[in-house]
Amino acid sequence: MSKYELDVVVDGFHYLEGPRWYKNALWFVDFYNKGVYRVNDEGVAEKIVHVEQQPSGLGWLPDSRMLVVSMKDRKVLCLEDNGELVVHADIWKHCEGHANDMVVAPNGNAYVGNFGFDLMGGADHKHTGLVLVRPDGTSQVVAEGLAFPNGMVISADEKTLIVNELFGNKVSQFDIKENGTLGEKRDFANFGELGDEPNLGVRIENASILPDGLALDSEGAVWIADTLNQRAVRIKEGGEILETVDTAPDGIFAVALGGQDGKTLFMCAAPDWNEASRTAETKGRMLSTPVKVGHAGTP
């Protein structure tokens, strides 16, 4: 495996998530600054919009309007051309916990995950689903039985959705039907079934990987943020680990492929994901390293 040198892109944040490379710029959110940011040509992160109920997943409609998940009120918001942030979809009834990550397909269909339970409040783990939000703002549940669906990507041919199951010890995938709904879930990479165990501590103890953020490359492999082991790993379908980027003592919580040639791996780093600690400190930062295989698919 290659040796990776890490660069710091930006630092001094609370907890970064949702990295995206869009229109030749790096975008991301800070949960606890409650902002969506874009890194400008001078390498400075500019706050684009404030999301009071905590921003998460990002994406763009075909007309270039930005969508952002508002976590705590379980909405998808749209940044209009005039700078107004409006409700694109209210998905409260479809979520059993905070709304979280999102991927927006080239046709404008958005797929949104949610926690499934009160993670920060210490509740028992419960499986949950994925919500499809159409360009007109209508929504429906299109998958169920996922263990904290998190990072998602859509293949370059727009026929497959791949999703991390953070507390499921696996990466799953679905066929995308012509109407935007999803087929049956199947494994992309499974590191051992954890079943219906409700105790989150036991699930984590029995897991070998905690797959958070996700990025797809042109060879069909995925980079994932492995929050359990302070690393980003490149995995081929079937579960073989091809490359490892060690980031200790930082944990990695989201990843993206970008840069002008699509061969820069961006990694959202922080000491942990504890809400109280990350709110109180500004140790969150964005790391990067060059990789050999470039970006594919969406985002």
Q: Residue ranges of each PLM-predicted region?
A:
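Short loop/turn segments immediately following beta-strands, especially the blade-tip
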Residues: 174-181, 291-296
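Beta-rich, blade/repeat-based domains predominating
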Residues: 10-24, 51-70, 75, 93-110, ...
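Short, solvent-exposed loop/turn segments at conserved positions within beta-propeller repeat blades
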Residues: 31-32, 71-72, 117-128, 166-169, ...
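Blade-level signature of beta-propeller repeat domains, shared across WD40, Kelch, NHL, RCC1
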Residues: 256-299
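A short loop-to-beta-strand structural motif that recurs across blades of beta-propeller domains
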Residues: 35-37, 75-77, 128-131, 170-172, ...
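Beta-propeller fold detector
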Residues: 7, 46-50, 86-90, 140-144, ...
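Flexible "stalk/tail and boundary" regions
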Residues: 23, 39-41, 46, 62-63, ...
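A short helix->beta-strand "capping" segment at the edge of beta-propeller domains
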Residues: 1-12, 39-43, 185-189, 198, ...
